[in-house]
C-alpha cells in the first residue's frame, strides 16, 4: 500500500468548492440524528460519497456508508479524505468515537479502515444469517477514538 496524497493536495484535486444543500424532507429522520453526507467530485463527476450520524445515546458517530464509484479514483486518497471529513463532523458533534460496520470477507475494506486508524472493537457471528461463520461473512465493528 502506498502513502495517500496529503489532504491539501487532495483538497485541491477533488474538492474544488464546498457546497451545502437543503432538503425538504429528512432522510431516515426517524432514527438518524443530524446526519451528514460528503461527496468527492472531479468536475461534475461524483467519484464517491460518505455519510454518517451522531448517536447521542452512546456518544459515538456512526459511519453508515462510504463508497468510491470511480475505479480510477480508488487508491488515490479519495476515501481517506471522505473519512477525514466524517471525522471532522464527528469531532464537531462532540462524539468520542467514530464507528462503522464491515464484514470479515471484505479484506480490502478492513485494510483501508486499519490504514486510517480504525481498530476492531467487536464481532457479531450471526448478524446476517445463522450460517455467517461458515460463509466467512461475520459482522465486524471497527472504531477510532476521537478523544
State where each predicted segment sits.
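Active-site rim helix/loop that mediates acceptor-substrate recognition in acyltransferases
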Residues: 1-37
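Structural preference for beta-strand elements that scaffold enzyme active sites
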Residues: 37, 60, 97-99, 141
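Conserved beta-strand in the GNAT
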Residues: 39, 45-54, 62, 67
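Short strand-connecting beta-turns/loops that link adjacent beta-strands
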Residues: 43-45, 55-58, 105, 147
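Conserved acetyl-CoA binding element of GNAT-fold acetyltransferases
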Residues: 59-71, 101
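Conserved acetyl-CoA-binding loop-helix of GNAT-fold acetyltransferases
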Residues: 68, 75-90, 111-115
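C-terminal "cap" of GNAT-fold acetyltransferases
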Residues: 96, 103-110, 115-119, 126-147
